[in-house]
Amino acid sequence: MPTPTKGARLGGSPAHERLLLANLATALFEHGGITTTEAKARRLRPYAERLVTHAKRGDLHARRRVMRVVRNNSVVHTLFTEIGPRYADRPGGYTRIVKLGPRRGDAAPMARIELVEALTIAQTAVSEAERARGTRFAARKAPTGATAEAADDLKNESPTAAAVAAEAQAEQPTAEAVAADDAATTEAKDTKPES
């Protein structure tokens, strides 16, 4: 029999704590994040990360070990087909705990535990296309490394994107042209005769 954790247990008995953590883990994998008390979130974190590690392995034994805890077949399927492969290259730290304000009724400290989202392939492609096009994120962060290579490939594949970027730069007036226009406007106002 495993040694129970020291200190107060969630729910009172070890069996209730085990079921409580199983239900919290199921809800976490089903919804991607849940709001609960800080104590429950801290106890759930290693429990859920262990299940994600089993899902990364992906073999039959790992699936059976997860099925002991998570009784919902659709959640187990999601865990092994989507969540596990998403974190294949990540060595740990699959969840994040964000502290929230106290609960209204009893002022219990609340927290949100959620799965750390990695950028999907589609999101990565969109951000690289925006950097290559010169919009949104281009001013904040210039492409580096593999991103720069992908942006160059995108420019080579799509000459229209490069042409659009060149036209946009050509259409933008320079600071000197704007200053000259302003000076001409003020001179025109000064030379008008008063009636």
Curated annotation (Swiss-Prot):
HAMAP family from the xrefs? Answer: Ribosomal_bL17
- Organism, by scientific name, is Parafrankia sp. (strain EAN1pec)
Is the keyword Plastid in the record?
no
State what protein this is by name. Answer: Large ribosomal subunit protein bL17
**Oligomer and partners:** Part of the 50S ribosomal subunit. Contacts protein L32.
The UniProt entry's sequence similarity note says: Belongs to the bacterial ribosomal protein bL17 family.
Bias type Low complexity, positions: 159-186
Q: Does the keyword Ribonucleoprotein apply?
A: yes
Would you say which domain of life the source belongs to?
Bacteria
Gene Ontology cellular-component terms for this entry are: cytosolic large ribosomal subunit
Which residues form each disulfide bond in the chain? none
What SUPFAM superfamilies has UniProt attached to this entry?
Prokaryotic ribosomal protein L17 (SSF64263)
Q: Name any Gene Ontology BP term.
A: translation
Q: What is the lineage of its organism?
A: Bacteria, Bacillati, Actinomycetota, Actinomycetes, Frankiales
InterPro entries linked: Ribosomal_bL17, Ribosomal_bL17_CS, Ribosomal_bL17_sf
Return the annotated region ranges for Disordered. 132-195
**Signal peptide location:** none
